[in-house]
Amino acid sequence: MANGSGKPKPAFFIAVLVVVAGLVGIAFYRWNAKKAETAQSVGSGKIDMGSIKQQAGGGSGSSQAENPDPNSITTVKEYAFEPASRLPEVPGTADYAALGKPRVVKFAVNVWAGWAPIIWANQGSKPKKMWKDGKGGEFQVELVLADNPVDMGNTFAAGKVHIGWATVDMLPLVVNRMSRDPRTMPRVFQQIDWSNGGDGIVVRESIKSVSDLRGKNVVLAQNSPSHYFLLNMLLNGGVQPSEVHMDFTKDAFQAAAAFNQDKKYSAVVSWSPDIYNLTKTGMGNRMLVSTQTANRLIADVWFARADFARDNPEIIEGLVRGILEADEDLKTDASKQAVGKLMDEFYSLPAGPGLTMLGDAHWTNYAENRDFFLNQNNPTNFERTYNTAFLLYKAIRSVDTKVPFDQIMDFSVIKKLGSEPRFAEQKNEYEFKFTPTTGLDVNVESAVLTKTVTINFFPNSFDLHKQIPAKSGTGEVPYDPNVDYTIEEIAKLAGQFGAARIQISGHTDASMRGVADESLVRELSTRRANAVKEELVNKYKMNPNQFVVAGYGWDKPADPKDPDNHAKNRRVEIKVVPAEAQ
């Protein structure tokens, strides 16, 4: 493409420019795509807890903020699939220690109150008592103490124990290690308990809220329930993990010792009894939050090797049934005294601590297990807890590839036992009993667990779903388009923090200051707060006594530096206040 003088024609330069522009465009596109990928990749940029919660909620990959399912989140909607249709096939011959004659199942546990039911069912740790399997055959159980989860995992993978223990938040880490051999992949059959005060964050007296941990040193055990607990508290409180300096120890007990010895640590995440020893009078420490408040956050479960579960379904049924029956037996004081002594002996404790630690966990009965495994709409079910843990650990680069929840969760035995009246008639007993209170009774400002959630209102309105003319001129749109999502998020928080008060405070703008009657202004703000409470109680069947409602009129602008921002001031604020502050 040249003219008579041998020089390129103008069209040549145009073509070159087009090619160069195209190459630059491709490079720019790929750079932006890489940048976006990096921003969303694990461990880089800010971690968005709201996004994690949306993805964890039984997600289908939809870009919608809410599940289009018309049922409310507390409506019982059970999974329609059968576990066998989702669980991967287990190839090859078994690779675990032979059971022998009589059959002896080796069941790993750690030093924890949650294992009281199986210790009671087995009458100690030794294989003495005869259990009945699903077909009436006999077997025995040997409880193996394995406190270190890494060592326990190695023993489990080697086939030296048939049953392992974990909290659901640990499972993404467990399956990440076990996925190389499908025979060792965990099959989770039963929830043992909810941590109910046994895990906690202890801080120095100067730390008043989660946000005060910014820039501070925290000591804890890495990739443990303590780690998951802290990540949840930080992100729900609006603090990025990168804003906190974390030092890791081998286990929670070493973390407590480090906190006690070194004043550079402003907080420690540990568990009972250390969290209570550290908060004794005169030590200068306090409990920021424990699973007494976040009482549906840490769930203990047991799991079998996939090859063992394949070969011994009747033993699995016998274990589930025996533990559930022991839950019922342990409701008497006499049985609690007796199991406390068995725990002292098994855990090599002096006389007494076994009984004392029983209150650290709530043993889950049949109804609570069914709700945990089968109720798709339960905001704190197995699926959501597992997915949330995976996404949190992926965000800090502890895991990469996800194993779907339904490839490790097997609710077949729980579902089968529902045909027996003694189980089917059980009720969920894990409900916190709130006493009515007022906004002035709760010290909200001193200890708020989560960042403040806000809903905005139209002038002179307390209608949550107020419609206004669309800017396009056609039809109407919600004044606050996020209100339904916000209400659902509050319901999820209230579920996780089952023993926390939910403070709902209503506010107005000050545009009529000096003109309007102040009592009318305060009444409007109170009505706004009550509208939020009523929506939660009516839509999600929540305990009305969990909510503390107050109307502040125009006394508390959203931003004291910008008190005349009327649109921001017409609002309701929702805060989660721990039981420890009540």
Residue ranges, per PLM feature:
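N-terminal hydrophobic or amphipathic helices and topogenic motifs
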Residues: A2-D151, A157, N365-A447
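Solvent-exposed, polar/charged alpha-helical surfaces in well-ordered, non-transmembrane soluble domains
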Residues: A116, W120, V150, N154, ...
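Periplasmic peptidoglycan-binding/anchoring modules of Gram-negative envelope and division proteins
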Residues: S446, F457, D463-G506, K533-V537, ...
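Pocket-lining segment of extracytoplasmic ligand-binding domains
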Residues: V168-M170, M178-S179, S242-D247, A252-A351
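Periplasmic OmpA-like peptidoglycan-binding domain that tethers envelope proteins to the cell wall
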Residues: H507-Q582
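Secondary-structure end/capping motifs
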Residues: R310-T401
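Short, glycine-/small- and polar/acidic-enriched structural segments
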Residues: G45-D48, Q64-D251, S266-S272, L288-S290, ...
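Second-shell loop/turn segments in exported
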Residues: V105-K106, E142, G215-L220, K264, ...
